[in-house]
Amino acid sequence: MSFFPKISFQHEVEEYLTKMFRNNELITTSGIQEMESKYQSLLSHLSHPPGFTTVRVNIHLASVKHVKKLLFEEIQKQFKGLCVPVLEHPKLQDTLLIPVIGPRRDLKKHASEVIVGAHCGYAVLRGAHVYVPGILSTSRFMKAGDLVSVYSDIEGKCKRGAKEFEGVKVFLGNGISELSRSEIFSSSGPLNGMGIRMIEPVYLSPSFDNVLPNHLFLQNLPSVVVSHILNPQPGERILDMCAAPGGKTTHLATLMHDQGEVIAMDKTANKVKKIKQNAELLQLNCIKTFCYDGTKALAVEKREDEQEGPPFLPESFDRILLDAPCSGMGQRPNMAYSATLKEVTSYQPLQRKLFTVAVKLLKQGGILVYSTCTITLSENEEQVAWALKTFPCLQLQPQEPHIGGEGMRGAGLSLDQLKLLQRFDPSAATLQGMDINSLQDSREDDLISLANKDCIGFFIAKFIKSNSK
């Protein structure tokens, strides 16, 4: 049952998605009623957080069992003795899952209100406290120590510093103010610390602020799956083409036992800095970062210098991950998607430029994994159909592990080809929520199965380069 309204789109984007979910291939096989029901279910799921928090253990520094024990103790402390299990994923040996409790519908709302920006609100729904930069408005006389109710401005209409807000807002839970209104909106400049400590969130997830920072990395479940599918081996040379903020980069290095070379590129300097910070935090030494545009990463001719960075010569890498820039429609939670249709459709040509470079940089016999965190055909299955037609040297490969669904019909791919693709579709799970009683009555196998479905929307394709055609 929905707690929040369905995700909203601009009208032209809504029409685009509706047409996509009513394509002839889908309607012929499933019927228009089934596809309409599935589409509406997806819209509801996207506005709610995933049912589990996924944590990747840095097995370079600690064992899963050890971190699981420490994490269980930390959660008990945060939840004041409430017993929420920490589950080991049977097919992802470095991954822990924590069920999310919620939505909690019976929370009392307080007179003192705090309005936060949409992105801050989404972080709160996944376990974060409220930090000052995310606060847009507070009640006029709010003091440090006040009990407050926190709301998200999902349409981006609230002006910073407002004393009240009458626009569309969504209740996120209750907290205690760490600062007064005057301190938050001080003219001496914005603060960066915690503004509201959440004590009764609508969705109860652990906060990971400074919790085992060397041993844990928060990732969405499909993002962990991607690195396992690429399956890098010690001593290999790997390219992560669009690497920020470094979750997959550091995972690849960990899977290689920090032996070999992982080249991580991003074209934004601040994002490259974040990759470096994460590599240092997790104590990984085989990662080399470069601020560079992936579409220009192929060297036209051999260079005189011995520089190890981009551009690179053809066939320089054993394996390549292209986690491509995308429209991001699979991210959860998201209650109001603001991009225009022009912005949504701009990603396909960019992805093809990056993909073309990736194919040329990949050695014969090498593996290329392409992934996105979106739900559109144009950025996923259509890209696979284009790639197979454009590059005869590429063949689709089975994925291990394969815990998501198959590819979506509508791009002209065969059933055998669709089975080789992995599409994580949040609507595959029932939007039911979880309370502590139902959690304690659940079998671990059932919880794992639910976690495999109740995650973000995501797509993965795996290719092998067979020859130099």
Predicted regions and their residues:
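A mobile, often basic/glycine-rich helix-loop segment
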Residues: 2-9, 50-52, 331-349
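Glycine-rich nucleotide cofactor-binding entry segment
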Residues: 2-246, 250-255, 269, 273, ...
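C-terminal catalytic and target-recognition region of SAM-dependent MTase-like enzymes
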Residues: 70, 78, 84-85, 89, ...
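The conserved SAM/SAH-binding core of class I Rossmann-like methyltransferase domains
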Residues: 151, 239-241, 265, 290, ...
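Short loop/turn motifs at secondary-structure junctions
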Residues: 234, 258, 283-286, 316, ...
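Short beta-strand element of Class I
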Residues: 259-263
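S-adenosyl-L-methionine
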Residues: 265-315
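Glycine-rich S-adenosyl-L-methionine
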Residues: 267-274, 337-363
